[in-house]
């Protein structure tokens, strides 16, 4: 990737961080970088193309963050707990980016790189779950099913927090405890 393209992505990332996804426009990006609008379009076909590149980068960041969080953890259940806490924290710290990654459907044909990056992250989680199953630490269900269950749980937990439905009266105010409890439900 060339410098200008990466700088365009960095400016876009800052715009999302400061003003949300709706604050991003090709014209505004060009202005911030002192480029003509046509110069921006030489690197990205449109705003959607640029956002797709950001999403791929976000998945790479999440994957890296997960990798760093599990270094040195040998216990499969503790490893899964670390992954889920990492997902949760990533979502909260990067709300708009998380919504861009998980809150919209990306066309597989038009943006295969987004699909590949998302699937790589899913497959990484599935591999850890499969390993935990091999070691007889979690329930014996098809790996795809158990991974889908884990994904549904953690994404639901993040979305409940985003919506402000993490009230103590519902028992939703302690995500780490909920993650631990969820894992105890799938342990053998």
How does the language model describe each region?
Residues 93-127, 134, 168, 172:
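Short secondary-structure transition hinges
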Residues 53, 57, 67-96, 146-150:
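Hydrophobic alpha-helical connector segments
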Residues 34-44:
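Short hydrophobic/aromatic patch on the recognition helix
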Residues 5, 21-23, 38, 47-48, ...:
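A short, glycine- and basic residue-enriched loop/turn
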Residues 81, 85, 122, 126-130, ...:
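An amphipathic alpha-helix signature
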Residues 5, 26, 48, 52, ...:
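Short, structured helix-loop boundary elements
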Residues 103, 111, 133-181:
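Hydrophobic/aromatic-rich alpha-helical bundle segments in the mid-to-C-terminal region
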Residues 1-19, 23-28, 32, 49-52:
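Basic, helix-initiating cap at the start of DNA-binding domains
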């Amino acid at each position: 990737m060339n410098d200008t393209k990466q700088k365009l992505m960095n400016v876009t990332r800052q715009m999302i961080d400061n003003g949300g996804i709706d604050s991003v426009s090709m014209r505004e990006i060009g202005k911030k970088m002192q480029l003509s609008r046509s110069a921006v379009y030489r690197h990205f076909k449109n705003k959607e193309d640029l956002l797709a590149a950001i999403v791929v980068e976000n998945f790479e960041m999440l994957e890296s963050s997960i990798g760093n969080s599990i270094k040195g953890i040998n216990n499969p259940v503790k490893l899964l707990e670390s992954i889920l806490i990492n997902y949760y924290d990533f979502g909260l710290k990067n709300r708009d980016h998380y919504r861009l990654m998980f809150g919209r459907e990306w066309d597989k044909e038009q943006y295969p790189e987004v699909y590949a990056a998302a699937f790589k992250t899913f497959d990484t989680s599935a591999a850890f779950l499969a390993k935990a199953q091999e070691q007889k630490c979690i329930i014996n269900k098809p790996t795809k099913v158990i991974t889908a269950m884990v994904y549904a749980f953690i994404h639901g937990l993040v979305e409940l927090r985003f919506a402000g439905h993490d009230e103590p009266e519902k028992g939703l105010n302690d995500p780490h405890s909920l993650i631990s409890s969820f894992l105890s439900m799938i342990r053998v």
